[in-house]
Amino acid sequence: MSNIYIQEPPTNGKVLLKTTAGDIDIELWSKEAPKACRNFIQLCLEAYYDNTIFHRVVPGFIVQGGDPTGTGSGGESIYGAPFKDEFHSRLRFNRRGLVAMANAGSHDNGSQFFFTLGRADELNNKHTIFGKVTGDTVYNMLRLSEVDIDDDERPHNPHKIKSCEVLFNPFDDIIPREIKRLKKEKPEEEVKKLKPKGTKNFSLLSFGEEAEEEEEEVNRVSQSMKGKSKSSHDLLKDDPHLSSVPVVESEKGDAPDLVDDGEDESAEHDEYIDGDEKNLMRERIAKKLKKDTSANVKSAGEGEVEKKSVSRSEELRKEARQLKRELLAAKQKKVENAAKQAEKRSEEEEAPPDGAVAEYRREKQKYEALRKQQSKKGTSREDQTLALLNQFKSKLTQAIAETPENDIPETEVEDDEGWMSHVLQFEDKSRKVKDASMQDSDTFEIYDPRNPVNKRRREESKKLMREKKERR
């Protein structure tokens, strides 16, 4: 166990949780997990965890809390959004008493946290470890798991955090926020689930059969009387002082269809109304109903007519807008054409200031006329291009054939066709390789060891060297 403590980095920060199971001291790794520690300390300073329950208990694994709603799906961080995970190579889920952030996925940390009750290697690199339980308070932490739980890992009587106290805050710049505490819709007694009722074992009693029969009869009577208000007639059927005849009999007869506000006052006079008067009243009511229905039908028809008229008016407005746009476009086009024509006229009417401008304008008109003669893109345009190419080829071959090779005229700047008959000639600057024995400025020095001259020279030099050695 000591090697585990040696591997873990030193802590920097301490918080005390006061729970219904006892006090729990938590030391924080604020350098290794700064975001998680800052979030936890600030929520403790803001009393965010006060009166929150430990809503999830997995025996031998974890105890989870920190959700103000108590459902396991609530809680927010101080950053206003889930913050990222912070993993460290020296912090592993290898023992009990570690405090880590609970999340629903990667980088989804909020306010919920959990204590480990044992080794949990499957949680490594999935949850951020930011603290550990120290001292004897680890036994109070273990008491949090000693509760009855249901199939959803929710305790029947969960422990809760009464208050939090920050003993050492490594973050001096934390400013607690003012959080409005939500009012609980139900009192705490109603939120807590009741313990399951025990079943009665009548076989242990000497009068068990009689007690069981009485219990069944009571249950049957309570089920039959459940949800119904009973009078003394229902409960005391054998009482001779109670009459079984109702006090007031309901009068059978046709009641009028419409009743006015003064119904109670006119009830006494209804008995004296003759049959003819009743028939007249019914006819009046029927006529009135017919008028109402016809008025409703008429109003519905008028509404449909109004809708049709509105839709027709909208269509007319759209058509008017479209026509207006077309007129504006035509007008703008007309103005542009008029401006172009005026510009052309002004160019024609203006006298050329000098010969160069006049020549430029003539050339421009010439090429514009040629451009107008050109056909549009397509097969005809391609045919025209091929015809021009063939014409140029024939012209080039004709110019070469007419000009003899010896009599090549010099090209002139103004002659556009002189270059067609010109022949390109280059100066021969190649150097000749001659014999190595001949000394010439234009020859290259070539050394070939197989050359007989070079062989003789080598033999003579060897002979001279031998003679020198002998003389010594």
Curated annotation (Swiss-Prot):
Modified residues annotated as N-acetylserine in this record: 2
Similarity annotation: Belongs to the cyclophilin-type PPIase family.
Keywords of this entry: Acetylation, Coiled coil, Disease variant, Dwarfism, Glycoprotein, Intellectual disability, Nucleus, Phosphoprotein, Retinitis pigmentosa
Comp. bias regions, Basic and acidic residues: 231-241, 269-286, 304-347, 359-371, 425-437, 457-472
Organism annotation: Homo sapiens (Human)
GO cellular component term of the entry, any: catalytic step 2 spliceosome
Coiled-coil features, chain-numbered ranges: 206-230, 306-377
Annotated TM spans: none
Start and end residues of each PPIase cyclophilin-type domain: 11-166
A biological process term (GO) from this entry: mRNA splicing, via spliceosome
This protein's encoding gene: CWC27
Entry-linked InterPro entries: Cyclophilin-like_dom_sf, Cyclophilin-type_PPIase_CS, Cyclophilin-type_PPIase_dom, Cyclophilin_A-like
Modified residues (Phosphoserine): 346
PANTHER family linked to this entry: PEPTIDYL-PROLYL CIS-TRANS ISOMERASE-RELATED (PTHR45625), SPLICEOSOME-ASSOCIATED PROTEIN CWC27 HOMOLOG (PTHR45625:SF6)
Protein name: Spliceosome-associated protein CWC27 homolog
Gene3D superfamilies (UniProt xref): Cyclophilin-like
